[in-house]
């Protein structure tokens, strides 16, 4: 169990072997903040050491809040939760998971894409990367939040080697409901 209660604002080292990486990443008001609106400080990450027997299955739950200030750009770029063969401190590719990251060959990625990137593709995605080749397993297209708004809610991620992965979000304009 990990929470960020009790850590002072600005904390970037939790003292537990995890790595908080990125110019914007820090604890703020008892929460992990990975980026700051309007500052272009993307590609932050929080990685934890390998957990023994996690390949036998796991469940992760957390509360998430995404806020976009008014008058800047539309919300960008997104975020992902990743499980795979990457090193501590790996920053990933935001909403693209670990795609095209050197040395990352096998990965499960639970993705939330808040930016249109020049086309209508945005939404939630469950992807896998095997031997370096990424495959999208489930995708729901739609906005996550509008310019100048906030969304929040619980996220539940599970992996079972026999039945696969599931990804569920609540409180977004477009939610993941991949069972």
What spans do the regions from the language model cover?
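Polar, low-complexity loop segments and adjacent catalytic/binding residues used for recognizing
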Residues: 1-179
């Amino acid at each position: 169990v990990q929470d960020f209660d009790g850590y002072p604002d600005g904390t970037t080292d939790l003292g537990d072997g995890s790595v908080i990486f990125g110019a914007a990443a820090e604890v703020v008001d008892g929460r992990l903040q990975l980026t700051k609106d309007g500052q272009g400080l993307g590609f932050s990450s929080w990685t934890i050491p390998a957990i023994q027997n996690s390949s036998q299955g796991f469940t992760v739950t957390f509360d998430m809040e995404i806020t976009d200030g008014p008058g800047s750009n539309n919300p960008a770029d997104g975020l992902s939760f990743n499980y795979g063969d990457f090193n501590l401190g790996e920053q990933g590719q935001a909403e693209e998971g670990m795609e095209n990251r050197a040395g990352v060959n096998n990965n499960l990625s639970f993705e939330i894409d808040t930016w249109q990137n020049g086309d209508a593709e945005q939404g939630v995605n469950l992807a896998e990367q095997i031997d370096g080749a990424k495959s999208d397993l489930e995708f729901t297209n739609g906005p996550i939040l509008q310019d100048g708004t906030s969304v929040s809610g619980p996220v539940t991620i599970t992996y079972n080697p026999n039945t696969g992965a599931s990804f569920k979000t609540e409180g977004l304009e477009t939610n993941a409901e991949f069972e």
